[in-house]
Amino acid sequence: MHEKERHGIILSAVQDRPVVTVADLCALTEASEATTRRDIAALHLQKKLRRVRGGAEAISPAPFVGLAGRPFAINETMHAPEKQAIARAAVDLCDDGDSIIINGGTTTFQLVHPLASRRCQIFTNSFPIAEHLLKHSKNTIMLSGGAIYREQNIILSPFDNDVTRNFYARRMFMGAQGLGPIGLMEADPLLIQAEQKLIHQADELVVLVDSSKFENRSSLVLCPLDRITTVITDDKITDKAAAMLGAAGVEVIVAQSGAGHKEGGAGA
């Protein structure tokens, strides 16, 4: 990632939270701690943020607090072939008539293309996913209510009793900030709250992550590994990551990017 892109992500992140730690910024930019500290120092000298102990803060915080994490437009360009292969493998699990939940994200957005030939009942909190499927498929679409967070292209409701409680699915598809021994990780408490509600509404949880996500870490844990039914990832997954999932009883499906379809295998 180029310096200009890293600086854009850092400045976006500090507008979203009172203080952003160096560790969080490393995860967002996929840069080393030393590089991240140099970026913070450079932006501090340019008076674009304020360097604080262990991280950075905004000089003029935004009145509307957004979500922590990389913007959708930046994530969309990263690991694109892997995401497309993962999405094809995920839709192979779906039959016509299935009820599914799709959590917003750039990997899950790739589901829209293979889903065009399906007829499923789909609940999503992603405006781009809903819009595309409405235009280009015969799936039945339900959209969650709430505020639209523009940079992540996701809709989150501040209310506990919303339409989410009225939809139950056979399977939920979602991405993540990171995946490790302690479980599935996310970048923002608001995402955690919304996604936990969705997870409760599905029998199976299918996590779509490219292999880089096994290296990412966050301080916020969404759910433990044993709540995950299946992980679909690309063929760069390490033996260590595959063994970690297998030990937790998680099925692993490896999608071959560039091959038109998946190669499957059980992690246990």
Specify the residue positions occupied by each region the protein language model found.
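HTH-adjacent hinge/linker in prokaryotic transcriptional regulators
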Residues: 2-9, 15-23, 27-30, 38-101, ...
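Conserved phosphate- and dinucleotide-binding cores of soluble alpha/beta proteins
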Residues: 2-12, 18-24, 30, 45, ...
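Conserved SAM-binding loop
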Residues: 101, 122, 187
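Glycine-rich N-terminal segment of FAD-binding domains in flavoprotein oxidoreductases
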Residues: 104-106
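Catalytic core of membrane glycerolipid acyltransferases/transacylases, capturing the structured
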Residues: 113-115, 122-131
